[in-house]
Every structure is written in structure tokens, then in C-alpha cells.
């Protein structure tokens, strides 16, 4: 099973990027994982709802280019299901046994994701009911994927 994290927003802060890269590297012995970021369209601070929806549609077109039919799409959204680390590990195990080629985690930028992209998802999860900057959410997600694999292997890390 391969994994992919798509972050519509670019990871600009070096400390977040270094952390994400570290967890992706640590995942190497367990799975193949890649990060795609920077699909975000520019939007002015005074954009109205109509302009925001148009931007979300443009971002949706970019996202679709990265999606495959033979994958599990997992959208991260504040309204998604919150899981414990142990539950996340069990879900990783189920996805690994699904016969699909890849699991793609998708995180929107500041204005979220187009509804049509959300509706394509097989799963919608939330890291927390708290709101995080998208860069931090990518880092937390990468860490939780790593933690999940460590739990599944019964290896020390998770306490």
C-alpha cells in the first residue's frame, strides 16, 4: 500500500517542512509515502463568497489530476470523525488490507475544499475539534500515520 498526503496549501515555514520530511523519512521502512503541496490558488483578503467558490473549483480541478480511481480518498475536515491513535492504527491496517493501491489524505487550504471533492471521499476524518494552521495539520497527520505504523508493529514509540 502506498500513501500520499495532498496539502492544497503550500508548506512555507521551514520548521513545519522539516518536521513533515522527518516523519516521511521515518515511514520509509513501513510504507511508500509522498507529499504533494502548493495547489492553492491566490485569493484576495476581501474575496466574496462567489469568488471563494470559484477558487475552490479551480483547486478542485488541480486536485482531480492527482486522484486515481483505485485509491482510498480520505479528506481531513473539522466535521470529520475524530479518532484516537489506536483507532487510526486499526484504520491503517484495514486500508492496507483493502486491496486498493493507495490511500490519499487530502487537506484543504484556508477556505477548505469544494463540496464535490469532499463527496468523493471514502472517509472524512478530523485530527481534532481544534482548528490548526494547515501546515501544522500536515505535520500532525504525518506523525499520526507514523505512530499508527509503530502501534501496528508493536514497536516502542507510542506511550
Curated annotation (Swiss-Prot):
Coiled coil regions, renumbered to chain: none
Residues holding S-adenosyl-L-methionine: 76, 108, 127-132
Keyword Ribonucleoprotein listed: no
Keyword Cytoplasm: yes
Catalytic activity: pseudouridine(1915) in 23S rRNA + S-adenosyl-L-methionine = N(3)-methylpseudouridine(1915) in 23S rRNA + S-adenosyl-L-homocysteine + H(+)
Entry-linked SUPFAM superfamilies: alpha/beta knot
GO molecular function: rRNA (pseudouridine-N3-)-methyltransferase activity
InterPro entries on file: Alpha/beta_knot_MTases, RlmH-like, tRNA_m1G_MTases_N
Enzyme Commission (EC) number: 2.1.1.177
UniProt-annotated location(s): Cytoplasm
Main localization category: cytoplasm
Signal sequence annotation: none
Taxonomy, superkingdom: Bacteria
Quaternary structure and interacting proteins, as annotated: Homodimer.
Functional note: Specifically methylates the pseudouridine at position 1915 (m3Psi1915) in 23S rRNA.
Name of the protein in its database record: Ribosomal RNA large subunit methyltransferase H
Organism: Syntrophomonas wolfei subsp. wolfei (strain DSM 2245B / Goettingen)
